[in-house]
Amino acid sequence: MELQLEHLSKTYGTVQALKDISYTFKPGIYGILGANGAGKSTMINLITDNVARDKGSAGGSILYDGQDILKLGSRFRGIIGYMPQQQGFYEDFSPKAFLRYMAEIKGIKGKNEKGQTVKEQIDELLEVVNLTGVAYKKIGGFSGGMKQRVLLAQALLGDPDILILDEPTAGLDPKERIAIRNYIAELSRNKIILFATHVVSDRMYS
């Protein structure tokens, strides 16, 4: 399993956000550390195909196991799990309803490799992010940290090979931050995890 960036570049008008980035990611955790505006989110948006690359060879390429992600189409959506830094919610949705909704959007059906139904996967993820007790509460009343945990759970739906996490511990208290970091560290044994942050301590895993 490999994710390759080859001469990746991105410009917005006259501003060069990324220039000639090349790297090969294999299973493990990779911290993308930088100040706000350093290009972390731009790189993530290119990998998740939420932003178009520069035209032609100037934009470079992104390959998953040797294939350009643009040619993988919808298949790549099942390979990647993305937790954005911010996302709008239907405020009347509960975490459980939101995760069911996201599972449908991602086309997650039937049972996974562990034999779990979608409902069982959702229940397990809610436990992982410590939201079981508020599984049926409206997200509109949640704190910023609780909303972050809902977003992390949706990124993990379907057990993707690649996890892209943009500021995943923002808004969490120290205890929650450590718990989430440790869980992500466990997942990294057989996943490629890109972890964008401006918090230096988030590079440290036990």
Language model features by range: what are they?
Residues 56-71, 75-76:
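Conserved ABC transporter NBD signature motif
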Residues 48-49:
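Helix-to-loop junction immediately C-terminal to a conserved catalytic motif
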Residues 100, 104-107, 111-134:
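Conserved ABC ATPase "signature" region
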Residues 152:
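Hydrophobic anchor residue at the start of the ABC signature
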Residues 35-39:
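Walker A (P-loop) phosphate-binding loop of ABC-type ATPase nucleotide-binding domains
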Residues 163-166:
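Catalytic Walker B motif of ABC-type/P-loop ATPase nucleotide-binding domains
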